[in-house]
Amino acid sequence: MILYKNVDICDLEPIAKNGILSIDECGNNNWDKGKRAENDTSVVYLFSPIGKQNSFPNYGAALLEVQCEAKENKIGKTDTHVDDYIEYITKRVKPSEIKRVIIPKIFKGYISVPKNIEITWCEFKAERYGNNGLEECSDEIIEQFVKTAQLMDSTDFNFFRGVTEKRTMIDLYNIEYIF
């Protein structure tokens, strides 16, 4: 089955070498204390998007497409993404089961990708709050976002948040990686 997982760009090299490992197996627990749901740390979480939003970069700006066996995991009713995707779990994802690493091509000049990692560069769409609620981001807003946002590591302060020229935050919603 084809499933997806967002990961940090800075973690691509060890993922390419070792696959996607559980927190228990790899020791990479980059969740802020008290901000992680009571999820099992001995499994790998994957997703299948329900709507048009197909990437959840709060977990990392690189989207991995994987083909592996996994079982559906019931998401709690209060989970942030309960209406966004179906969650799956597996013990681990082998490197050979990672089919693509997908990153928006507009990020190219602002990130560092290991030379041995093949990237599928994609288009990028998102929405942000404007005067009339959520509205599609203009090309100018997307460019300003990419120039000013931290994109490599989700533990960085203000990760995946841009700043306008007037110094207000650019927060994106309903993010689509178009590939």
Question: What kind of region is each of these model predictions?
Answer:
Residues 11-28, 72-89, 110-122:
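Surface-exposed flexible segments
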Residues 26-99, 103:
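ADP-ribosyltransferase catalytic core
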